[in-house]
């Protein structure tokens, strides 16, 4: 078993202990069983990776302590009367940051389109969750169509992303919390190439969540730091 240390942070789920120092900084620790072998939240189905990236990557929605869906990257959303079209309005104060906490770019609707295309092209472990849900995605994954613009995800503008489904799914919003539908910045993705999310290098991904990953020491510790510029840092 290995431990996780979270520095200067708010509460983390499944924490087993906490402490404070003279500066008022808080440290939370919990036990995890397996080291992650990569940070690719878009493609891996491994819990070891998700346990790390769920603290540093935000999707459109998240669950509150009661299991209700609340805003995350999306500040508002709506569904068409026929239940086939879901439209999400992104908050304009959400940003991407490097592992050093430097602002990289705004989080935009195109990031969600880029994320799903990447997941489909890389045959993500999580595709089964959405492949038959999103219009045209199954055909794209199978190679029956090659133009991703025919898939039912669109960036209507910088802050509006829309999904078109094959049939109504009352549980669709739950899927927006999954890694396969998470965003990624296209410029950063292209700059990294095959090194994107490779291994456990914190600098191999960008961060739009409440914490920044600082280090992973195999069979020893994972260290996070509170993102001081996170839109909901307080």
Each PLM stretch: what is its role?
Residues 22, 36-43, 68-70, 96-97, ...:
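Short, solvent-exposed loop/turn elements at domain surfaces
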Residues 31-81, 206:
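N-terminal lobe/hinge region of extracytoplasmic solute-binding protein
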Residues 11-14:
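C-terminal motif of bacterial Sec signal peptides marking the signal peptidase cleavage site
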Residues 24-34, 85-89, 112-115, 161-162, ...:
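Short, well-ordered beta-strand elements
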Residues 16-18:
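Bacterial signal peptide processing site
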Residues 1-6:
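Sec-dependent N-terminal signal peptides
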Residues 148-149, 158-159, 164-234:
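Gly/Pro-rich hinge or "lid" segments in bacterial periplasmic/extracellular proteins
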Residues 75-126:
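Aromatic- and charge-enriched surface segment that lines or borders ligand/interaction sites
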């Amino acid at each position: 078993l290995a431990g996780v240390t979270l520095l200067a942070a708010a509460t983390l789920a499944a924490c087993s202990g906490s402490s404070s120092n003279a500066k008022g900084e808080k440290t939370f620790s919990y036990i995890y069983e397996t080291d992650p072998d990569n940070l690719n939240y878009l493609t891996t189905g491994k819990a070891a990776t998700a346990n790390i990236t769920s603290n540093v990557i935000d999707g459109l929605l998240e669950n509150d302590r009661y299991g209700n869906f609340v805003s995350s990257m999306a500040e508002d959303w709506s569904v068409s009367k026929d239940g086939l079209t879901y439209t999400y309005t992104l908050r304009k104060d959400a940003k991407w940051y490097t592992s050093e906490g430097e602002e990289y770019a705004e989080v935009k609707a195109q990031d969600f389109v880029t994320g799903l295309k990447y997941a489909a092209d890389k045959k993500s472990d999580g595709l089964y969750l959405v492949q038959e849900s999103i219009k045209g995605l199954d055909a794209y994954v199978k190679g029956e169509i090659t133009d991703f613009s025919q898939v039912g995800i669109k960036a209507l503008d910088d802050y509006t992303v829309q999904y078109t489904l094959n049939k109504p799914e009352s549980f669709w919003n739950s899927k927006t919390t999954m890694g396969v539908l998470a965003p990624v910045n296209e410029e950063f993705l292209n700059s990294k190439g095959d090194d994107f999310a490779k291994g456990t290098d914190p600098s191999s991904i960008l961060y739009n969540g409440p914490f920044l990953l600082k280090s992973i020491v195999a069979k020893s510790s994972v260290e996070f730091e509170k993102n001081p510029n996170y839109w909901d840092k307080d």
